[in-house]
Structures are given as C-alpha cells and as structure tokens.
C-alpha cells in the first residue's frame, strides 16, 4: 500500500512546522492580521493544521470536529482581494520553504504549493 502524502512528508511534525511558521508571519503581517478577527491566532492555527492534515491523508479530525471543510463558505465573511491572497501566499511560501528537502522533497513541495496556490486563488471574493 503506498504512503499517503501526509505520511511521505513526515506527518504531523511537518504540518505543525508549516502552520506554526505561517502563523508566526501572519501575526506580524499588517494585511493578513486584519483578516483574522480573533486576538489570539491559536484557533485559526489549529483549524488550518487539522484541515491540511486531513486533506493530505492524515487524521480526519477536521471533519470530525467541524464538518465538511466548505472553504469558500467559511471564508465568505472575510474580504479577500488579490492583496490578501498575495500576502497569504507569500507567508505560506516562506513557511513551506523553511522545511528541509529531506522532509519535503521537490515533488511533494511542488504538489503542496500548487494546491495552496489554487486554494488561495479560489477564495478571492473582492476586487479591492
């Protein structure tokens, strides 16, 4: 049986690292910080980590706790323009780039980034 993407890239440890490094940047980014209504980003960090782990073949904790992901619906209340999309992608690219190539080889890195870019583009809901 082939390994899932989740297992192939180191499982929870890798996704924890990506998401924690991403949110460390979000906390300091004036564009993105406005998108998050909570003062504490821990809840958002946990939700993204659970979502990514599930999407890539890990535990189904996200769906068990929150139901179907419905990304567009869950992000609809927030104004997401090209500016927010680009800031999100910049932070996510930096977080993914911080993972060593033994853990996240070029093929898996590209697959992950392709998905993240597609998802970010699909969530844009405002021209401004």
UniProtKB/Swiss-Prot annotation:
InterPro entries: GlbO/GLB3-like (IPR044203), Globin-like_sf (IPR009050), Globin/Proto (IPR012292), Globin_bac-like_CS (IPR019795), Hemoglobin_trunc (IPR001486). Pfam families: Bac_globin. The keyword Metal-binding applies. It comes from the Bacteria. Binds 1 heme group per subunit. Its cofactor is heme. It is found in: Cell membrane. Contains L-DOPA (3',4'-dihydroxyphenylalanine). Coiled coil: none annotated. Its main location: membrane. The modification 3',4'-dihydroxyphenylalanine is found at residue 36. It is a peripheral membrane protein. Heme binds at residue 75. One of its GO terms (biological process) is oxygen transport. One of its GO terms (cellular component) is plasma membrane. Keywords: Cell membrane, Heme, Hydroxylation, Iron, Membrane, Metal-binding, Oxygen transport, Transport. Homododecamer. When expressed in E.coli and M.smegmatis, HbO increases oxygen uptake. Membrane vesicles of E.coli carrying HbO show a respiration activity about twice that of membranes without HbO. HbO seems to interact with a terminal oxidase. Therefore, HbO could participate in oxygen/electron-transfer process, suggesting a function related to the facilitation of oxygen transfer during aerobic metabolism of M.tuberculosis. Belongs to the truncated hemoglobin family. Group II subfamily. This is Group 2 truncated hemoglobin GlbO. It comes from Mycobacterium tuberculosis (strain ATCC 25618 / H37Rv). The lineage of its organism: Bacteria, Bacillati, Actinomycetota, Actinomycetes, Mycobacteriales. The gene is glbO.
